[in-house]
Amino acid sequence: MTRAFYIGRFQPYHFGHHAVIARIAEEVDELVIGIGSAQKSHEAIDPFTAGERVLMVYNALEHLSIRHYVVPIEDVRYNSIWVHHVVSRTPRFDVVYSNNPLVIQLFREAGFCVKESPLYVRERYSGTEIRRRMIEGEKWEHLVPKPVAEVIKSFDGVSRLKNVSTSDSNFSL
């Protein structure tokens, strides 16, 4: 049995992530999905909480054909211990999928088999672009699985993102 690990911030989870996970699912028996930077939320580039992101991923993958685990993973201060940190918080895994150069480097140095996951139409499916659309009031729902849009709407995530993205430079005491 082969169990893989794939990590992302999922701010928000989108069809690019969905395509990569579907491809990984064709190659392995189980998948551990790490919610990276789990401690971050309520910021312009990280507006959603770990719990909200877990729900997005869980709901989007309801029909995934393989067993999967969704695990929040907080950042650590030192990259040299990050892999150990990940391993201590997840079920054991045999292979890592990533396209992030730092993640690839750290896991290879730790002796893991690493496979690069191709980006899926990155210019269209990127968290940065989706958040920009949300802030600007443009259509974004077609870039994420329907269950993800439903989760974001359930806690008024677009309003939160707009609020945390507003500059306070005009504020004075």
UniProtKB/Swiss-Prot annotation:
UniProt xrefs under Gene3D superfamilies: HUPs
A Pfam family: CTP_transf_like
Reactions it catalyzes: beta-nicotinamide D-ribonucleotide + ATP + H(+) = diphosphate + NAD(+)
One GO cellular component, as annotated: cytoplasm
Pathway recorded for this protein: Cofactor biosynthesis; NAD(+) biosynthesis; NAD(+) from nicotinamide D-ribonucleotide: step 1/1
SUPFAM superfamilies recorded: Nucleotidylyl transferase
Main location: cytoplasm
One Gene Ontology molecular-function label: nicotinamide-nucleotide adenylyltransferase activity
Protein's GO biological process: NAD biosynthetic process
Assigned keywords, A-Z: ATP-binding, Cytoplasm, NAD, Nucleotide-binding, Nucleotidyltransferase, Pyridine nucleotide biosynthesis, Transferase
Subcellular location: Cytoplasm
Family statement drawn from the similarity comment of this UniProt entry: Belongs to the archaeal NMN adenylyltransferase family.
Official protein name in the record: Nicotinamide-nucleotide adenylyltransferase
Native species: Methanosarcina mazei (strain ATCC BAA-159 / DSM 3647 / Goe1 / Go1 / JCM 11833 / OCM 88) (Methanosarcina frisia)
